[in-house]
Amino acid sequence: PQTGENGSGWMYMYTDSLIRGFRQTHQPSPWINDYGTFSIMPVFGKLVTDNKSRGMSFRHENEKAAPDCYRVRFDNGVTTALSATSRGAVFEITYPSEEGQYIVVDAYQHGGSVAFDKEQNCIYGTTRYNNGGVPENFGNHFIVEFDKPVVEAGTDENSCAYVRFRLNAGETLTVHTASSFISHEQARLNLSREVDGRSLADVSAEAKRIWDEQMGRIKVEGGTEEQQKTFYSCLYRTLLFPREFYEFNEQEEPVYYSPYDGLVHNGYMYTDNGFWDTFRAVHPLFTLIYPEVSERIMQSVLNAYNESGFMPEWASPGHRGCMIGNNSISLLTDAWMKGIRTFDKDKALEAMVHQTQARSEEISSVGRDGYAEYDSLGYVPYPEVHEATAKTLEYAYADWCLARFAEATGHKDVADTYYQKAQNYRNLFYSEKGFMWANDSDGKWRENFDATEWGGPFTEGCSWHWTWSVFHDPEGLSSLLGSHKLMAARLDSMFVAPNTYNYGTYGFVIHEIAEMVALDMGQYAHGNQPIQHAIYLYNYVGEPWKAQYHTRNVMNRLYNSGPEGYCGDEDNGQTSAWYIFTALGFYPVCPGTSEYVLGSPLFPKVTISLPEGKTFVIDAEGVSDNNCYIRTAELNGVDFTRNYLKHDELLKGGEFRLLMDSVPNMERGINTEDFPYSYSTK
């Protein structure tokens, strides 16, 4: 359902009272907006095609939404229900009386076209709507079929088509639709395969089966009903992106229209994903729970490289100028280290190295912005390069990932080079202030240090948030901060420091600032990604019980199953995936290590279904709101003192038993051999 006007990134607002269309959307974010969009809208009474005027009022008590089906009864008595497949959908629509029964199909202008085919009793068209990241020949080709005779049809000047029916009051009109980015012929093939001749009930039942299988791979037991609703709502959101952009030809082979070179290729393509967000927890979740999806995504990343010269960092559907870093390298490395090795390792290494040594001329976020300065100075200088300190920290982590991959695939010379570059984070630690800060190209520290200043050398945050972005070497960060105890004290202070801010170069209070202030958790800003791993860093400095306390506190305070269930941007599933992992009791602080750092499990029992029929069971005896601390742990009956689990330990299956308590065990997980990976101690 679309409540916003065409072109608005806010396509469905819970506070809105009008629906303007039922939209085939590909939108991954309101900031990125949509592409390849068309909508289908019942209109009753007077014919109105314009999206600004055709909306019909509804109330939420007459609306029901589930992963497999959506239903609404409008205030004028029209009912609409729909269920979707991968590339199509089925609608059932009824009208309260016989006069003025219309369907409007909107191709969103932007050079789109629509027409009515009388012989086929269908509307077909092409929508070319986009907000960037597409070749010149881009189009989404669609077909909309009706099971009742059309008595009138027409089009308007705004790429809308309409049809009128004359049905009995309450009689069901069934609409079948499908689309293709390849051609109308492929759209027809998609329609015949996925929805042709199928009822709403058929499609809904199949959708429910698929969602049950996907979400059923993690079974939680116990906890409150609200906690279970929140958990599975987060899992649902995590599974929405990235989007399958491939189709199947007549031979049932995967093919796709490339949003990079505009040609049709064999193989897999995924899109609608910002790796700056999703490398942290979404893709690590796929490697563990949905490895077959992760395999195809890695192939897709390299397909994009072959077709454009760069791996994607933010794709929708092609390269978009958004965010920073080289986190495509993280995805490939993490997958490889976890045994997902169906992609070309030599091509992957070639693509990784190229990603660090070039930058797209058109889009600064594609490739490595400031790579020449980074290589010559050991950091990206500010103000010469926007967001330079954040980029330096991101590049250092990406270089570590590249080194890990090169080492694992037998390229020691490359590994040695990039392991050295992975230490560049040290070059922007301002020891006099104890925070990450900015240097110019002459090596001078930026004046007027302010750890609460947003923007400038940082991305959507301040030094309080970005100082922790040393995923691959918390031990090295600890040495910069002075000791394990001093790093733990700095983490403590993050939660109690005044939640003041300086909006800096942003010039106004961006929503991430407002969200941090509203959370009232000091300088901890869970509503945005850079700091979401920071709680788990207590495990690296011998105070794991604090990670257990704070992770539970964040889950309980900042998430719920309602319309306002997130404390900030959900961002392609990342904020949801944080909750999924954290509710299980562990989190992938550093993708590429194959380690999951412990927190506090939320449920008494969780069963994870794994490949080859294996299961990994997490038993948290005595867990409750008060009992958030780990007293003791056993892995397959053997005492377990480490602050992390290994990926291979999970994949083998088994049982992880935890005895939970209301008071912390300050003797568990305090020895350095129990700490997770850091490059400085490898």
Language-model segments: residues:
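ATP-dependent phospho-/nucleotidyl transfer catalytic cores
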Residues: 398
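Extracellular attachment/recognition segments
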Residues: 629
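Accessory carbohydrate-recognition regions in carbohydrate-active enzymes
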Residues: 1-330, 336-393, 401-427, 433-436, ...
